[in-house]
């Protein structure tokens, strides 16, 4: 099987994440997309929402799509979650699968700073999601396939700010995610 891997903090997951996964699934001819919420993201000092609640938010976001699932692999570690370690472990557990790591094309610029990036390039092919008309440089040694994406301006930061200001997030997040944010009183000031 060809599996797309979508890592992230997902604080909260939103329609942009789901659209990226769907576009990558179609364009890369993936059989499924696995969402990999980071328990302890290496690039952030802290998260707004607990790891357990973020995991539940991702589960709620993908539950209506049979081709999407959530992996808890990064929750098995007590240390920071590095993509290289996660990929190695997934390949060990599922040698019959071919994996593609989905990444925003804008993140290709910093890919060389990722933990063990040179070895990561050898481990996995990247599906780089590009905005219409965008140009990007592919790091030397990285195997990258472009995934076209319609322009969609939505971010987890914006969603948290909207909630804090009492503004609607309807249609920016899947309805089950919106309901959990409301029920748990997340992001409110």
Swiss-Prot record:
> Key word RNA-binding present in the record?
no
What reaction(s) does this enzyme catalyze? nicotinate beta-D-ribonucleotide + ATP + H(+) = deamido-NAD(+) + diphosphate
Q: In which pathway does it act?
A: Cofactor biosynthesis; NAD(+) biosynthesis; deamido-NAD(+) from nicotinate D-ribonucleotide: step 1/1
Could you tell me the EC number(s) of this protein? 2.7.7.18
Which GO annotations describe the biological process of this protein? NAD biosynthetic process
Record key words, sorted = ATP-binding, NAD, Nucleotide-binding, Nucleotidyltransferase, Pyridine nucleotide biosynthesis, Transferase
GO molecular function annotations of the record: ATP binding; nicotinate-nucleotide adenylyltransferase activity
State the SUPFAM superfamilies in the record.
Nucleotidylyl transferase
Pfam families in the record, alphabetically?
Answer: CTP_transf_like
- The source's domain of life comes to Bacteria
Q: Which family does it belong to?
A: Belongs to the NadD family.
Q: What does this protein do?
A: Catalyzes the reversible adenylation of nicotinate mononucleotide (NaMN) to nicotinic acid adenine dinucleotide (NaAD).
Name of the protein in its database record: Probable nicotinate-nucleotide adenylyltransferase
- High-level lineage: Bacteria, Bacillati, Bacillota, Bacilli, Bacillales
| Gene for this chain | nadD
